[in-house]
Amino acid sequence: MEQYEKVEKIGEGTYGVVYKARDRATNETIALKKIRLEQEDEGVPSTAIREISLLKEMQHRNIVRLQDVVHSEKRLYLVFEYLDLDLKKFMDSSPEFAKDQRQIKMFLYQILCGIAYCHSHRVLHRDLKPQNLLIDRSSNAVKLADFGLARAFGIPVRTFTHEVVTLWYRAPEILLGSRHYSTPVDVWSVGCIFAEMINQRPLFPGDSEIDELFKIFRITGTPNEETWPGVTSLPDFKSAFPKWPAKDLATQVPNLEPAGLDLLSSTCRLDPTRRITARGALEHEYFKDIKFVP
């Protein structure tokens, strides 16, 4: 750890404390994540080390680069490129952002580029939210943070500071207890983030797992075997769930153009097998006026 000098604590993420730090060798500013392990006395699980090592291979302009992994005295430090702005802070400080449909489209496109890259390497995020979409102020590039960490460390119910980990972006198959979910969970999260950029408020702001599910079902309609084959077999599905009819998504996101609404509805399909893929979303007509392909 001698190589890195902590400058200041900048936040407390899902997995531990995040510091702004300096690489003594290059003088570069970096972000240092100290991973808090549940079984501290047992040291770092080898599975976590393996997973994290794979993430060093992931290099893409829309992913926050993992530069180094430092494993010392039962502690694990992850060294990332330093970015001090995230999408949540950006939205909170820019009330005009919702009116800039072009900017929203560019952000969404970049988020999907990063996700498509990760999915092509069989890496899931599982906990996408505006707080872990970082923005490079100099280029307006959006970069995804914390990709792959859920598989290495699991997603705790609470952060180590006892904040509840948000459920607002969590896919219905996870909320219903599915153990066999895959890449569509990230696409669901992106749909929620897309709607939030347009509306300037979260689409499904549930305060518990059941409240989250019901907020979703009130808009999408309560699923059944016809609309989502296999749903009644999921561990946490209850036949006593209220049976809400589906609403037109246009009533929930009134300021979105028709092509955007079509894309949004294809990310927010309850049945994960019918949800659009990240790669498919990039080819959607909503993006037809975007010239560059990162």
UniProtKB/Swiss-Prot annotation:
Active site annotation, chain numbering: 127
Catalytic activity: L-seryl-[protein] + ATP = O-phospho-L-seryl-[protein] + ADP + H(+); L-threonyl-[protein] + ATP = O-phospho-L-threonyl-[protein] + ADP + H(+)
Pfam families named among the record's database cross-references: Pkinase (PF00069)
UniProt keywords, alphabetically: ATP-binding, Cell cycle, Cell division, Kinase, Mitosis, Nucleotide-binding, Phosphoprotein, Serine/threonine-protein kinase, Transferase
GO function term, MF aspect, one: cyclin-dependent protein serine/threonine kinase activity
Record InterPro entries: CDK (IPR050108), Kinase-like_dom_sf (IPR011009), Prot_kinase_dom (IPR000719), Protein_kinase_ATP_BS (IPR017441), Ser/Thr_kinase_AS (IPR008271)
Summary of the tissues where the protein is detected: Found in most organs including root, young leaf, stem, vegetative meristem and flower bud.
Amino acids binding ATP: 10-18, 33
A GO BP annotation: cell division
GO cellular component: cyclin-dependent protein kinase holoenzyme complex; cytoplasm; nucleus
E.C. numbers: 2.7.11.22
Broad EC category: transferase
Keyword Nucleotide-binding: yes
Signal peptide location: none
Regulation: Phosphorylation at Thr-14 or Tyr-15 inactivates the enzyme, while phosphorylation at Thr-161 activates it.
Intrachain disulfide bonds: none
Sites of Phosphotyrosine modification: 15
Family: Belongs to the protein kinase superfamily. CMGC Ser/Thr protein kinase family. CDC2/CDKX subfamily.
Role according to the record: Plays a key role in the control of the eukaryotic cell cycle. Component of the kinase complex that phosphorylates the repetitive C-terminus of RNA polymerase II.
PANTHER family named among the record's database cross-references: CELL DIVISION PROTEIN KINASE (PTHR24056), CYCLIN-DEPENDENT KINASE A-1 (PTHR24056:SF548)
Protein name: Cell division control protein 2 homolog 2
Gene for this chain: CDC2B
